[in-house]
Regions:
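Short, flexible helical or helix-coil boundary motifs
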Residues: 20, 24, 48, 92-93
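Negatively charged, low-complexity tracts enriched in Asp/Glu with abundant Ser/Thr
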Residues: 1-43
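Mixed-charge, Lys/Arg-enriched low-complexity segments
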Residues: 2-12, 64-95
Length: 95
């Protein structure tokens, strides 16, 4: 069993990255405009659910927000490791 995310949401991205097998996601929406791809995912991990919004430009996430049911919103500006989750999820969907 993977480690649960604390109710404060602290370290959520790091915990998910260490336990990717317990991290699940479903693509809800994908759009493309001017060469940029926008994705909206429903995400599930152990004790929490949420959404992941990603805007990709040239294969790199330029805007991203992980909104967890714990009341925590994680963005690229407050956790640079979110980029790793974005790349992981988008690569899996496009594989």
């Amino acid at each position: 069993m993977a480690k649960s995310i604390p109710s404060s949401g602290a370290g959520a991205v790091r915990i998910i990255l260490k336990n990717k097998d317990a991290f699940h996601f479903d693509l809800r929406e994908k759009k493309e405009d001017n060469g940029k791809q926008s994705y909206l995912f429903d995400v599930y991990y152990e004790n929490t659910t949420g959404t992941l919004n990603v805007l990709m430009d040239n294969g790199e996430p330029v805007i991203a927000a992980l909104n967890l049911s714990l009341g925590k919103v994680i963005t690229l500006s407050n956790d640079t490791n979110l980029k790793k989750i974005c790349n992981y999820v988008v690569d899996k969907v496009n594989a």
